[in-house]
Amino acid sequence: MADKITSRSEDYSQWYIDLVRSAKLADYADVRGCMDIRPNGYAIWEKMQAALDRMFKETGHVNAYFPLFIPESFIAKEAEHIEGFAPECAVVTHGGGEELAEKLYIRPTSETIIWSSYKKWIQSYRDLPILINQWANVVRWEMRTRLFLRTTEFLWQEGHTAHANPEESQEEVLRMINVYKTFAEEYMAMPVIMGKKTDNEKFAGAVDTWCIEAMMQDSKALQAGTSHNLGQNFAKAFDCQFQTKDGVLDYVWATSWGVSTRLIGALIMAHSDDRGLVLPPKLATRQVVIIPILRGDKAAVIERANALAQELNKNGIPSFVDSSEQNSPGWKFAEYELQGIPIRIELGPRDIEKGICIAARRDTLEKTELALDETLPDQISEILNTIQESMFERALQFRTEHTFEVQSYEEFKVAVEKGFVIAHWDGTAETEAKIKAETKATIRVLPEEADYIAQYRIDEPGTCIYSGKPAARKVVFAKAY
């Protein structure tokens, strides 16, 4: 019930944990740093998977699966990659009661094991491109964990593609980060800023990393997806060459891209409230709950409620009836608000007499009287569409209100406690590191969206807020998850 949930204003971190557990999305497992994803949480992941998988296939990708275990020699082949991931790796040293001749790493990501296979599959330009996605689990040995946001084991998808030239691989990088942006905004109702990471923040072994960054309700940033241009780094590490159309040997060009169950954490923190989960309809497995008010002729009310659910389901609106009598209507209202069901329909004997029902929106709690006739499915569809759009607009307005442009480091230190800060940066890793050490804020993204660049004059040259040196452009700073 919602009374178990700490308010956001009292303790945002505790609110998040309380909500995740009370809404039965996930819980702490008996294995250090791991979580149990409960059916309510996994249902959201399945909706995300279905939408993303469709989008991947529409862009020409196919699914495959590669081993969980990666030989130590594979990991060591890409020096920058292993340096970035070594502290997070879990290692298997024994199997079958004996010490292994070579240690096996449990995948923190799959570039190395996949490129060992690509080397066998690619001989000619005719074998390219390879456009493969994998749905899998990965392990990264996290010291400080938080349900969905940072756990030792988590679920994700990782795309790995191989190309004949750098132009194709860069097109792929941009195509997939745009897929993620579309998914975040159209399905999650979560506005994101798309752009590049700094060299300090990019993926280990990548030439460039593109990302989407979202703002949570505590004004912190959350990286919601990444797409990496790997250049020829992994192809060279695994000696993956192909014969070009001109008959010469060249190394393959590569990309990788991924999102994880972290998106569920982002969804919660972007939209939910002190009553519980608020879900965008496109990611809600159950969009409508019908609660009969059981007075008078109970059987007739339940029969009408079931008929209504049947009609909505027939029209593609996933609906169900809670006609149980062990809990009061008020208890049910609170319970389904906690679970984030987008629309609640209240139906009593007087409503049936009048030919109406009451529909309550989860996002605003606003109630509307609707006619109990053949137009009801269309009315409900319209409300669901309005909820989806309104959630995005509210999140966008919140981000706008918590985005600040500053001209000095003193202004920066105040503003970064309140949200995103747009400021000039001199482009050096030294300045980036000093700002992070002093404020815990990082450069989240070098924006590359035309609208965002125009809105905040990102390309306008100026003076670095920290060093006073010339700066070619502005960047987005924030504290982050």
From Swiss-Prot:
InterPro entries: aa-tRNA-synt_IIb (IPR002314), aa-tRNA-synth_II (IPR006195), aa-tRNA-synth_II/BPL/LPL (IPR045864), Anticodon-bd (IPR004154), Anticodon-bd_dom_sf (IPR036621), Pro-tRNA-ligase_IIa (IPR002316), Pro-tRNA-ligase_IIa_arc-type (IPR004499), Pro-tRNA_ligase_II_C (IPR016061)
Reactions catalysed according to its record: tRNA(Pro) + L-proline + ATP = L-prolyl-tRNA(Pro) + AMP + diphosphate
UniProt keyword annotation of Ribonucleoprotein present: no
GO biological process: prolyl-tRNA aminoacylation
EC number(s) from the headed UniProt entry: 6.1.1.15
Class in the EC hierarchy, top level: ligase
Domain of life of the native organism: Bacteria
MF terms (GO), sorted A to Z: ATP binding; proline-tRNA ligase activity
UniProt keyword annotations, A-Z: Aminoacyl-tRNA synthetase, ATP-binding, Cytoplasm, Ligase, Nucleotide-binding, Protein biosynthesis
One Pfam family here: HGTP_anticodon
Cellular location(s): Cytoplasm
Family note: Belongs to the class-II aminoacyl-tRNA synthetase family. ProS type 3 subfamily.
Assembly information from the UniProt record: Homodimer.
Function: Catalyzes the attachment of proline to tRNA(Pro) in a two-step reaction: proline is first activated by ATP to form Pro-AMP and then transferred to the acceptor end of tRNA(Pro).
Domain description: Consists of three domains: the N-terminal catalytic domain, the anticodon-binding domain and the C-terminal extension.
Name used for this protein in its record: Proline--tRNA ligase
Organism (species): Pelodictyon phaeoclathratiforme (strain DSM 5477 / BU-1)
Taxonomy of the source species: Bacteria, Pseudomonadati, Chlorobiota, Chlorobiia, Chlorobiales
